[in-house]
Amino acid sequence: MSNVWFTSDLHIGHAKVAEDRDWAGPDHDLHLAELWDEQVGKEDVVWILGDISSGGTRAQLDALGWLLNRPGRKRLILGNHDRPHPMYRDAPRLSRLYWNVLDYMSTAARLRVPLDGGGHTNVLLSHFPYVGDHTAEQRFTQWRLRDEGLILLHGHTHSRIIRSTMTNPRQIHVGLDAWHDLVPMDEVREMVNDIEEGL
């Protein structure tokens, strides 16, 4: 049986982000590889909600090599540091390299999450939250999904806060800066059920 995992903002090879992540220790990328390899099985699905690297061509190639060596089926929701994102003119050129590693790549996706009382609800996946950023300015607004009431799993903010009732209680941050780990579907399902129950 396969499991489903979520994460965001890996930033493989990104020295500034690694420095800010004191929890990851001196070898950030090795620490993330160990976390991944200990939990993810060959048939598991890992949704990466953007920013595999710092965005330069060499950094992207290194991050793709890092991902290629990790178990599981990787699905990438493109972020602002991922060059295949349509915000970049050279997106088609680098997309081919990404497809060698990924089995899905898009700017957004929708998943069904089971509800405790039966049935399911739809959640959206995007790198960008409905609202929030790690700067004072709300950047990349033209690439953000419009909030029409669906729960949103996101990254981008580099916040340690998983769910904020002050910004939008229907968005869940699955980034490494909040979790320090991959997020299993069971955790997401629990939070989604809490939101649907008004908690």
Swiss-Prot record:
- Please, which domain of life does this record's source organism belong to? Viruses
Q: Which SUPFAM superfamilies match?
A: Metallo-dependent phosphatases
Coiled coil: which residue ranges?
Answer: none
Gene3D superfamilies to which the protein is assigned, alphabetical: 3.60.21.10
Q: Name one Pfam family in it.
A: Metallophos
* InterPro entries registered for this protein in UniProt: Calcineurin-like_PHP_ApaH, Metallo-depent_PP-like
Question: GO molecular function terms here?
Answer: cyclic-nucleotide phosphodiesterase activity; phosphoric diester hydrolase activity
Protein name, entry field:
Gene 66 protein
